């Protein structure tokens, strides 16, 4: 009896086996990888960001028995030294924003509006302070302007100065170091904002007689406000939370320095808890300034 294949085609070949469905690659389906990546990111943030913050706030708002209380903050407000540290931190942050704004705006305008020799090289030089570790900068200042620094040694040798002059030790030194370290944050944001300004707006202002300082004040500066505020907020928060620079320069009455000193002493439980209270207060203030800056930008019209 002939096969069906032989009858139809006469080839005598056996029928080809049916094609099997393509095999799936081993492991998770391709559509599951984005979900897995998002899960890992959230797990990382929860473990290393959310949990530490929650633990700080829990310890700051609780007593030794674990009961929620505001007594720790009452003690903070009743201590004149901590209140002075809070005021000093706010004043230093605002002063640093002011000085970095002047220097950062000037350099940004120079880089964007003027063409000069080695402009690109100069723009790279302005990035060095921000990419170098903060401790390197403050140590460099002490080597140059400290009591035994280069400047004081030259003053003693050349001008017979009896006592070394205090150039950097104190709040003025912290302001100087923070300004020269953080002004690139203003410069970078303002340069980006200046590059996005429509030249037609400034040309229209010039056509009606607005030139020089008047054009800068009424057209250019308002249009750079969103970018400037982003840089100013970074400068303020960085200065507000920096403890290494003040400690090296002998300034202890700042919130960040007190938080560090109280937490690392590991002896007095009350001081340790006060360090956590200061840390929680700094986080709350930083969030408040961030919300205020975002709302200020939101209610302004920059179109």
Regions found by a protein language model. Name each.
Residues 208-210, 222:
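Glycine/proline-centered hinge or cleavage motifs at structural transition points of membrane proteins
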Residues 117, 210-211:
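Short coil/turn motifs that cap or connect alpha-helices
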Residues 62, 143, 243-269:
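Glycine-rich helix-loop "coupling/hinge" segments at transmembrane-helix boundaries
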Residues 66-69, 191-203, 212, 225, ...:
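Transmembrane helix boundary and interhelical loop/hinge segments in multi-pass membrane proteins
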Residues 12-18, 61-71, 147-160, 250-258, ...:
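Peri-membrane helix termini and adjoining interfacial loops of integral membrane proteins
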Residues 30-64, 74, 78-195, 223-243, ...:
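Membrane-water interface segments at the C-terminal ends of transmembrane alpha-helices
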Residues 1-41, 293-303:
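Transmembrane alpha-helical segments of polytopic membrane transport and secretion proteins
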Residues 6, 18-22, 199, 214, ...:
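Feature of multi-pass inner-membrane transport and sensor proteins
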């Amino acid at each position: 009896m002939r096969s069906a294949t032989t009858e139809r085609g006469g080839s005598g070949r056996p029928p080809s086996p049916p094609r099997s469905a393509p095999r799936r690659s081993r492991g998770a389906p391709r559509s599951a990888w984005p979900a897995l990546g998002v899960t890992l990111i959230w797990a990382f943030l929860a473990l290393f960001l959310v949990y530490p913050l929650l633990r700080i706030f829990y310890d700051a708002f609780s007593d030794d028995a674990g009961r929620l209380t505001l007594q720790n903050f009452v003690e903070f407000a009743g201590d004149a030294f901590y209140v002075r540290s809070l005021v000093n931190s706010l004043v230093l942050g605002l002063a640093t924003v002011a000085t970095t704004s002047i220097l950062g705006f000037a350099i940004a305008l120079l880089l964007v509006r003027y063409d000069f020799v080695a402009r690109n090289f100069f723009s790279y030089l302005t990035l060095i302070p921000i990419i170098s570790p903060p401790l390197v900068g403050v140590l460099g200042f002490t080597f140059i302007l400290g009591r035994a620094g280069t400047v004081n040694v030259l003053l003693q040798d050349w001008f017979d100065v009896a006592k070394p002059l205090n150039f950097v030790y104190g709040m003025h030194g912290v302001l100087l170091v923070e300004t020269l370290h953080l002004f690139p944050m203003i410069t970078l944001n303002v340069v980006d904002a200046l590059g996005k300004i429509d030249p037609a707006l400034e040309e229209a202002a010039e056509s009606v007689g607005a030139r020089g300082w008047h054009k800068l004040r009424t057209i250019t500066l308002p249009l750079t406000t969103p970018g400037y505020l982003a840089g100013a907020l970074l400068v303020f928060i960085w200065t507000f939370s920096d403890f290494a620079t003040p400690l090296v320069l002998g300034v202890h009455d700042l919130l960040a320095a007190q938080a560090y000193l109280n937490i690392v002493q590991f002896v007095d439980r009350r001081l340790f808890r006060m360090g956590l209270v200061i840390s929680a207060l700094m986080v709350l203030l930083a969030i408040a300034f961030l919300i205020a800056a975002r709302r200020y930008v939101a209610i302004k019209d920059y179109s």
